[in-house]
Amino acid sequence: MARYLGPKLKLSRREGTDLFLKSGVRAIDTKCKIEQAPGQHGARKPRLSDYGVQLREKQKVRRIYGVLERQFRNYYKEAARLKGNTGENLLALLEGRLDNVVYRMGFGATRAEARQLVSHKAIMVNGRVVNIASYQVSPNDVVSIREKAKKQSRVKAALELAEQREKPTWLEVDAGKMEGTFKRKPERSDLSADINEHLIVELYSK
C-alpha cells in the first residue's frame, strides 16, 4: 500500500479531528472546517456501525503516526505479545519509533519532516547514524542531529516551533546541543486522550 501524498488537511477533515500532519501550533479547526467532510460542500457523513467506528479509529491513529497498514498490523501483533494492556502497548510502540521521537523532541515540525530527516541520515542514536524511521528507541538512548545537519533552516524553525508546544515529560531535550534523551516509554496518561485504542483492539480481536 503506497504512502498518501495528497493534501494533509483533507485527511484530518475525513477523520473529523486534527491528525497533527501540518506544522504549527494553531489548532487545525482555525485553518479549515474540521467537522465538514472533504468536498466542496462536505459530503454527508453516514452513521457508522460498530465496525465502522473501530475502523475509523484505526485509520486515524495510523495516519497520525504515518504508518502503513501492514506495519500497523505488525505493531498490533507485537503489542498483543507483550505483557500488559495491548492498546497501551501499541501506543508505546508507535511512540518509540525514531521518526516520532525526533518529532516529539522538536527536531522536525511534523512527523513527516522528522521521517525525512531520518531517511536523509541527519539523525544519530547514541552517536551512530540511523536512517530507519521505524527504529525502536530504548530508554536512555540519546538522539541527536548530525553536525552537518544542524545548520538546516528547517531544523532551527522546528525547534522554535517546539518552544510553543507542551514538552513531553518522558523526554529530556537540550535544544542548544540539538540532542535529547529518551528517558522512558510514555505512560498512557502522557498521551492524547483523543485516541481510543480499545476500539483498535476490538477491531483486530475479531
Swiss-Prot record:
Pfam families for the chain: Ribosomal_S4, S4
UniProt-listed SMART domains: Ribosomal_S4 (SM01390), S4 (SM00363)
InterPro entries: Ribosomal_uS4, Ribosomal_uS4_bac-type, Ribosomal_uS4_CS, Ribosomal_uS4_N, S4_RNA-bd, S4_RNA-bd_sf
GO molecular function: mRNA 5'-UTR binding; mRNA regulatory element binding translation repressor activity; rRNA binding; structural constituent of ribosome
The entry's keywords: Antibiotic resistance, Repressor, Ribonucleoprotein, Ribosomal protein, Ribosome biogenesis, RNA-binding, rRNA-binding, Transcription, Transcription antitermination, Transcription regulation, Transcription termination, Translation regulation
Gene Ontology cellular-component annotations: cytoplasm; cytosol; cytosolic small ribosomal subunit; small ribosomal subunit
Any one GO BP annotation for this protein: negative regulation of translational initiation
Top-level division of the source organism's lineage: Bacteria
Coiled-coil parts of chain: none
SUPFAM superfamilies: Alpha-L RNA-binding motif
Residue ranges constituting the S4 RNA-binding domain according to the UniProt record: 96-156
CDD domains, sorted: S4
Family the entry assigns: Belongs to the universal ribosomal protein uS4 family.
NCBIfam families from the UniProt entry: PRK05327.1 (NF003717), rpsD_bact (TIGR01017)
Subunit structure: Part of the 30S ribosomal subunit. Contacts protein S5. With proteins S3 and S5 encircles the mRNA as it enters the ribosome, which may play a role in mRNA helicase processivity. Some nascent polypeptide chains are able to cross-link to this protein in situ. The rRNA transcription and antitermination complex (rrnTAC) consists of RNAP, NusA, NusB, NusE (rpsJ), NusG, SubB, ribosomal protein S4, DNA and precursor rRNA; S4 is more flexible than other subunits.
Known role: One of two assembly initiator proteins for the 30S subunit, it binds directly to 16S rRNA where it nucleates assembly of the body of the 30S subunit. With S5 and S12 plays an important role in translational accuracy; many suppressors of streptomycin-dependent mutants of protein S12 are found in this protein, some but not all of which decrease translational accuracy (ram, ribosomal ambiguity mutations).
Name under which the protein is recorded: Small ribosomal subunit protein uS4
Species per Swiss-Prot/TrEMBL record: Escherichia coli (strain K12)
Gene: rpsD
